[in-house]
């Protein structure tokens, strides 16, 4: 009754909408799966933001007294005009970060400045040794400067740093066997909840401080007293840098998680719109098929 051409044409016309419908249904499943995944990630980022906000509030509260001690210790080098001798070449470079990520450019900014300092000091003929406080800074620099690493410290940033932690780091540096003449400690200084600045502060060895011209006016200072004060001074500066770095890290993580949550919301809105449009297209095609079939009858 029907010709072969007519049957072939009818078969093609009948199968094409079914293929499109299957394709659209698969697309809807993919979109639904992506929406579910993004919503789960958004829950995680919001939770991490809340945790970071609580840790940031504590870190900022503890930073104020630590900053007083740190700036007081640094004032000694400034007021006494202590400088590293030009003929001495041993330099110690300390980078302060932590073991945890998801906090923006906190760790990479420290690594970038340390690499720049290493290049500058090496070009000036200095012998540079590195100390990494935190596993992140060690992971970044160890690939390119493994031969210059003196010591690296882990388990940093999981708990609020204490003066005891700074004392352990200072004691480890003094007992490392590397008799540096001067050094620098690089850390992120907290400025506001959305801002921090990578800073570098000087540190000096006991011999450098004792042989400074400005220290000669204090004839009655005992050598043991000066040694104890210098060790305490080093621990103070490390403690100050740890507190500054921790506060900067928590504020940066809070900002990063807030941005991630906002980006997730935007993606959810776009995918929801795409889902609705695709579903509407499927419904429209099904209605066209029904109407066309009814008209053919």
From Swiss-Prot:
Gene Ontology cellular-component annotations: mitochondrial inner membrane; proton-transporting ATP synthase complex
Highest taxon above the source species: Eukaryota
GO terms assigned for molecular function: proton-transporting ATP synthase activity, rotational mechanism
ATP-binding listed as a keyword: no
Main location: mitochondrion
Modification sites for N6-succinyllysine: 49, 115, 154, 270
Record: transit peptide: 1-25
Modified residues (Phosphoserine): 146
Pfam families given in the database record: ATP-synt
Residues where N6-acetyllysine is found: 39, 55, 115, 154, 197
Membrane topology term: Peripheral membrane protein
Primary role: Subunit gamma, of the mitochondrial membrane ATP synthase complex (F(1)F(0) ATP synthase or Complex V) that produces ATP from ADP in the presence of a proton gradient across the membrane which is generated by electron transport complexes of the respiratory chain. ATP synthase complex consist of a soluble F(1) head domain - the catalytic core - and a membrane F(1) domain - the membrane proton channel. These two domains are linked by a central stalk rotating inside the F(1) region and a stationary peripheral stalk.
Subunit note: Component of the ATP synthase complex composed at least of ATP5F1A/subunit alpha, ATP5F1B/subunit beta, ATP5MC1/subunit c (homooctomer), MT-ATP6/subunit a, MT-ATP8/subunit 8, ATP5ME/subunit e, ATP5MF/subunit f, ATP5MG/subunit g, ATP5MK/subunit k, ATP5MJ/subunit j, ATP5F1C/subunit gamma, ATP5F1D/subunit delta, ATP5F1E/subunit epsilon, ATP5PF/subunit F6, ATP5PB/subunit b, ATP5PD/subunit d, ATP5PO/subunit OSCP.
UniProt protein name: ATP synthase F(1) complex subunit gamma, mitochondrial
Primary gene name: ATP5F1C
């Amino acid at each position: 009754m029907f010709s072969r051409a007519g049957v072939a044409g009818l078969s093609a016309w009948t199968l094409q909408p079914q293929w499109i419908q299957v394709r659209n249904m698969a697309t809807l499943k993919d979109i639904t799966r992506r929406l579910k995944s993004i919503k789960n990630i958004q829950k995680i980022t919001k939770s991490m933001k809340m945790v970071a906000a609580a840790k940031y509030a504590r870190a900022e509260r503890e930073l104020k007294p630590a900053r007083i001690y740190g700036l007081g210790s640094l004032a000694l080098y400034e007021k006494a005009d202590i400088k590293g001798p030009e003929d001495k070449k041993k330099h110690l470079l300390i980078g302060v970060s932590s073991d945890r990520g998801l906090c923006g450019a906190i760790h990479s900014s420290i690594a970038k400045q340390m690499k720049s300092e290493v290049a500058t000091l090496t070009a000036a003929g200095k012998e540079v040794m590195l100390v990494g406080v935190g596993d992140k800074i060690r992971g970044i620099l160890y690939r390119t400067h493994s031969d210059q690493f003196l010591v690296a410290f882990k388990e940093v940033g999981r708990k609020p740093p204490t003066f005891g932690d700074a004392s352990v780091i200072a004691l480890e540096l003094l007992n490392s066997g590397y008799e540096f003449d001067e050094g620098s400690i690089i850390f992120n200084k907290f400025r506001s909840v959305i801002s921090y600045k990578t800073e570098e502060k000087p540190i000096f060895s006991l011999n450098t401080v004792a042989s400074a011209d400005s220290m000669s006016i204090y004839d009655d200072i005992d050598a043991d007293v000066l040694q104890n004060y210098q060790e305490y001074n080093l621990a103070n500066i490390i403690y100050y840098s740890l507190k500054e770095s921790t506060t900067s890290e928590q504020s940066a993580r809070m900002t990063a998680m807030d941005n991630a949550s906002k980006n997730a919301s935007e993606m959810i809105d776009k995918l929801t719109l795409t889902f609705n449009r695709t579903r509407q297209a499927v419904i429209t095609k099904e209605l066209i098929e029904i109407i066309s079939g009814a008209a053919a009858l």
